[in-house]
């Protein structure tokens, strides 16, 4: 079988264009993992976030590893009212966490 591969996790904050349109979506990209099962948890300042989360099913990449994405939909007020947001990805018992912090300037 294929060797186990830990995921690469990238977390993107909302774009300034999106915030100007009164929306805020955080995107957590999870790529190059095997086997194709991951658990994604979102946190605001360390507290679990359940609402507004949408995670895609892992899909197989051309290199036979898997990729998935998770989206967290917020209002700009929610985004600005927290110090940090984290995307926590658990794969085969190991956890990768990426954090973004809202900047004051826009």
Curated annotation (Swiss-Prot):
Biological process terms from the Gene Ontology for this record are:
adaptive immune response; B cell receptor signaling pathway; immune response; immunoglobulin mediated immune response
Q: Which InterPro entries match?
A: Ig-like_dom, Ig-like_dom_sf, Ig-like_fold, Ig/MHC_CS, Ig_C1-set, MHC/Immunoglobulin
Q: Where in the cell is it found?
A: Secreted; Cell membrane
Sorted alphabetically, which Pfam families does this protein's record hold?
A: C1-set (PF07654)
- Which CDD domains does the annotation name? IgC1_L
Q: Which UniProt keyword terms apply here?
A: Adaptive immunity, Bence-Jones protein, Cell membrane, Disulfide bond, Immunity, Immunoglobulin, Immunoglobulin domain, Membrane, Secreted
Domain Ig-like intervals: 7-101
Q: List the disulfide bonds.
A: 28-87
Look up the coiled coil feature and give its residue ranges.
none
Q: Which GO terms describe its cellular component?
A: blood microparticle; extracellular exosome; extracellular region; extracellular space; IgA immunoglobulin complex; IgD immunoglobulin complex; IgE immunoglobulin complex; IgG immunoglobulin complex
List the SUPFAM superfamilies. Immunoglobulin
The entry lists its GO molecular-function terms as: antigen binding
- Lyase as a keyword? no
Q: Which domain of life is it from?
A: Eukaryota
Q: How does it assemble?
A: Immunoglobulins are composed of two identical heavy chains and two identical light chains; disulfide-linked.
Role noted for this protein: Constant region of immunoglobulin light chains. Immunoglobulins, also known as antibodies, are membrane-bound or secreted glycoproteins produced by B lymphocytes. In the recognition phase of humoral immunity, the membrane-bound immunoglobulins serve as receptors which, upon binding of a specific antigen, trigger the clonal expansion and differentiation of B lymphocytes into immunoglobulins-secreting plasma cells. Secreted immunoglobulins mediate the effector phase of humoral immunity, which results in the elimination of bound antigens.
This protein is called what? Immunoglobulin lambda constant 1
Q: Which gene encodes it?
A: IGLC1
């Amino acid at each position: 079988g294929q060797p186990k591969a830990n995921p690469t996790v990238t977390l993107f904050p909302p774009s300034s264009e999106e915030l100007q349109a009164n929306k805020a979506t955080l995107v957590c990209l999870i790529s190059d993992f095997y086997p194709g099962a991951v658990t994604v948890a979102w946190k605001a300042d360390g507290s679990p976030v359940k609402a507004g989360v949408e995670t895609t099913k892992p899909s197989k990449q051309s290199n036979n590893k898997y990729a998935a994405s998770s989206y967290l939909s917020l209002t700009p007020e929610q985004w600005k009212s927290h110090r940090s947001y984290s995307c926590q990805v658990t794969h085969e018992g190991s956890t990768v966490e990426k954090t973004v912090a809202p900047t004051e300037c826009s």
